[in-house]
């Protein structure tokens, strides 16, 4: 069983920034990364990566000291801004006119973004949303330890926005020794429910941790998804066995590498196990169906500090009249109703109501209502 690792804590709201003149503007990705670095969500990282750690993560999926880390957490700035900065300086980190933190600059370097795209996303295709975002962001990286000096005020989900130290406390309060984490950016459909409940048979608690940071424009909005999770948990899950809290990070769509990243982060939130399903964190056809599971064979459970639980693609079988997978169902593909978040989105956008084999009625009602609201605001 994994041992609970120590959490980084770089939050200090009493930190005096009044004498610091220089500033770096943060985009939404860097802002959410700043919070997760400070609250320990990205432990053992204490700041944005310097060149040595960046190169090591891109090339080997490890930090320079050998610890497993698969996604480069970087602070991009323009060449103009970079020219005004010096190693050793302390600089304010700002967004929307607010100072949210400071960085002690340890490194300023120009990355090879094509190499980063190829190794992290396995493609340089700009149609890939992660690659597109990588190329759109400024071209110089600033590395160094950070301090979060101001918490976010206009948090859309305050009651569900818990730091890792708080989720750990919640699990402890419930007496959960084993907790399985589930990452999602989609409404939970019946295949997800089947997988989650299968995992719940072997652990004490389920940590449903939907990502609510920046996602693709055609992903269902976070507020609609949160309402869909609430109605699902109220009606179909044992209340004392499930805990819902948001993951405020941006989606990278980095497939296999992001699966490792998501597992490491959930370890920090207090999970002992992590669900990895079909095409985890994938997009389009960039990654193989089970590539995000296969990547875990490169690491031991001990060095990850969390146990991955792999699930095959599940479906509704019309002959079994139940959710199943190829491990539990003998029938052919003609009897299988394949479920996916993409399929649910497609049906809804075409004005069709997903059948009960796809999604719970209460969830569908929330999604239809949310979609109508979206159409009106457009």
Swiss-Prot record:
EC code: 2.7.7.4
InterPro entries, per the entry: ATP-Sase_PUA-like_dom, PUA-like_sf, Rossmann-like_a/b/a_fold, SO4_adenylyltransferase_pro, Sulfurylase_cat_dom, Sulphate_adenylyltransferase
Gene3D superfamilies assigned to the protein according to its UniProt record, in alphabetical order: HUPs (3.40.50.620), Sulfate adenylyltransferase (3.10.400.10)
Reactions listed under catalytic activity: sulfate + ATP + H(+) = adenosine 5'-phosphosulfate + diphosphate
Gene Ontology MF annotations: ATP binding; sulfate adenylyltransferase (ATP) activity
GO BP terms: hydrogen sulfide biosynthetic process; sulfate assimilation
Family recorded in the similarity comment: Belongs to the sulfate adenylyltransferase family.
NCBIfam families: PRK04149.1, sopT
The protein's name: Sulfate adenylyltransferase
Organism placement in taxonomy: Bacteria, Bacillati, Bacillota, Bacilli, Bacillales
Encoding gene (name): sat
